[in-house]
């Protein structure tokens, strides 16, 4: 068991970068340089533990690793690296990781420059008083333009980039310089008395099938040790610690963790939902008087229904959801039934990427075929009797007569784009009811700030933005609250039956065009039947658009040659009566592709 590290020999730091700028690769190189793993154990992106993280090249869960580094001054330092997610959906995880560190490496791709998500995280780091060391990655690429990117860092972020470390994480070039910069330019942990009552921040937690919940902590004051009884200040849970240790990057047991150290503990906690990220952990018998600042409850922003393709898979889906919830407390769900899709769940997510990842993990790790309904956001409603309600599912909207006001969530979006795509991007934002706040030019690129309704962004805004800008635009957003809007519920009726899975709330000005679009799309996608199928879009009791799928008809008069016309008439009338009866009792099956395609807004 190792002794506790003196505080002045500890460096806690995180790596901030936009998606694909080489953050996880740099982390791999640092682990390799410090001998954290042997070459045989080394795999690409050691810290991205989920397959899906490696495939998409993104970090979803924050990870930590402790490294020992002997610097050029002969001293041995303990480096605690926290690898944070880069995506906007996981902004809260990032903020908690940054709060556990004193410094950051800002990694910027020398061929691409500063992107929107880099900025969001850098500003968070600056708010936490971080010392920031700029690192220019991929300098071996032919397209790398080091001077231009240094200029961008100085102009956009306002950091001095003259002594930025230049590296290529892929080839390992410049990695020793990064390690020296961490030791010499980043500060050791501030304050922290080891005799004071325990005060530690809960940075993250994950579920291990053997150990149960493993909690990642950063100790600020006091000592965290085995057999100690601790209390979570937020949730009030009291636990006895079974194991304490650090990530090297494998779990390595220790006797205790002192001030400034980052490590883990295991304490027979049943599920990750019992641990709130950002909570303060203290001793049960001798608690600290004040919790650490910055905690907030993570609220789901986007909701959608998930239904099994085969109704028999419902129990498997429920079990799979329970397992995912063990590891991801920000994902919420409750059961719901849909007339069109049967039994399923209404799920809440932090954002669209989070939704996609959960869906993909359900189908990949649990081998489930799922139908997902259109993502929707949380609307607030003021009722005539003075009550306030939240609406998660447009199909459950109460009668319009009882509602005095509907408010929808708005976001402040920042978009960075090369100049040539600016026109199309402005048009996209205008089409989505956006309000332009600011347009500025920085380092040869346009920076557009817009306020947009989240409802308009939630389905395919990001895909459209990427396709318009050939992937060059980057996008970041923060929620700015709810605003009252003139919203109506658009219902789609197939064969005069409302399809609850296709119900949505839209702005009154756009309801008609949206309804027409949906009807036209469904007309192409629903297979023809033996009877006529009307497809209608309705607001309240008023139909605003209609398409009709014509019936397939058999030529019943083919066998009549000449002869009496009444014979033909009789056969045609018989066919018409049969079709009428079919239309009365016939159920129209809507194929899954029709659901998905009908929900994609812009036909391209």
Curated annotation (Swiss-Prot):
Protein location: Cell inner membrane
Q: Does the keyword Disulfide bond apply?
A: no
What's its EC? 3.6.5.n1
Q: Does the keyword Nucleotide-binding apply?
A: yes
The record's catalysed reaction(s) read:
GTP + H2O = GDP + phosphate + H(+)
> Which terms are listed as keywords in the entry?
Cell inner membrane, Cell membrane, GTP-binding, Hydrolase, Membrane, Nucleotide-binding, Protein biosynthesis
Gene3D superfamilies from the UniProt entry: 3.30.70.240, Elongation factor 4, C-terminal domain, Elongation Factor G (Translational Gtpase), domain 3, P-loop containing nucleotide triphosphate hydrolases, Translation factors
Which Gene Ontology molecular-function terms are recorded?
GTP binding; GTPase activity; guanosine tetraphosphate binding; ribosome binding; translation elongation factor activity
Q: What is this entry's stated membrane topology?
A: Peripheral membrane protein
- What InterPro entries is this protein classified in? EF-4, EFG_III/V, EFG_V-like, EFTu-like_2, G_TR_CS, LepA_C_sf, LepA_CTD, LepA_IV
Which biological process terms from the Gene Ontology are attached to this UniProt entry?
A: positive regulation of translation
CDD domains hit by this protein: EF4_II, EF4_III, LepA, lepA_C
Q: Which residues form a coiled coil?
A: none
GO terms under cellular component: plasma membrane
Q: Where is the tr-type G domain?
A: 8-190
Q: Which Pfam families match?
A: EFG_C, GTP_EFTU, GTP_EFTU_D2, LepA_C
The residues the record assigns to binding GTP are 20-25, 137-140
Q: What does this protein do?
A: Required for accurate and efficient protein synthesis under certain stress conditions. May act as a fidelity factor of the translation reaction, by catalyzing a one-codon backward translocation of tRNAs on improperly translocated ribosomes. Back-translocation proceeds from a post-translocation (POST) complex to a pre-translocation (PRE) complex, thus giving elongation factor G a second chance to translocate the tRNAs correctly. Binds to ribosomes in a GTP-dependent manner.
HAMAP family xref list: LepA
Q: Which family does it belong to?
A: Belongs to the TRAFAC class translation factor GTPase superfamily. Classic translation factor GTPase family. LepA subfamily.
This chain belongs to which protein, by name? Elongation factor 4
Lineage, please? Bacteria, Pseudomonadati, Pseudomonadota, Alphaproteobacteria, Hyphomonadales
